[in-house]
Amino acid sequence: VYKLNMGGMTAFNNPIGNWSNAYNMLNYVNSFLENGLTDQVQYNRTDPEVDKQIKLRLEGESYFLRAWWHFELLKMYGGKAKNGKALGIPLADHFISQDEAAQNGEFLRPTYQATVDFIVNDLDNAIELLPNVYQGDDLEFGNTQIGRATKAAAAVLKSRALLYSASPAMQDDDVTKITGMGQFEILNPTVYQAKWEAV
């Protein structure tokens, strides 16, 4: 509201539309995971081994992007409900058709931790498939591939998701209770400590 009142709202930082935009991006990623990595699709017709490596990289990038968009949604819309439970966001783990999307009751909010677990699983898959770095002058895996996800980028996003999930503000009320601005009470030290150790 402050940003809107001060004239700081632009087409690039307007929160209206974030939900649908992110789920559209997730649908593109899921469509690619389901259709873009099959044997019928070739990215290098002259060398089957290079084609295989490209597909592995693209699969890793897809898992990275799916985790990225879920995390963006989680940062904006995840949090505690009135009942004290930390809620996540509906997970898009497959391509969602218009008919399926029309069934609003089918998309329930999992817990915050279940959402983080989904994100972390996608990032673990990405870490396995992505290259460490892009170096050399190779057309597909060389240093001209600027801005592509790497193992390190996936590991950083994973650590951030785990850090957010360990925050006292994102714990159920039976683990931590917020008592004021920046103040909280730990009700279940074992669970609280375990989340921080996971980071």
Please identify what each model-predicted range represents.
Residues 24-28, 87-93, 158:
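Short coil-to-beta-strand
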Residues 46, 77-109, 169-197:
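Short coil/linker segments at helix-helix boundaries
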Residues 81, 146-148:
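Short, solvent-exposed turn/loop segments enriched in Gly/Ser/Thr/Pro and often Arg
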Residues 2-79, 102-142:
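Conserved, well-structured interaction surfaces
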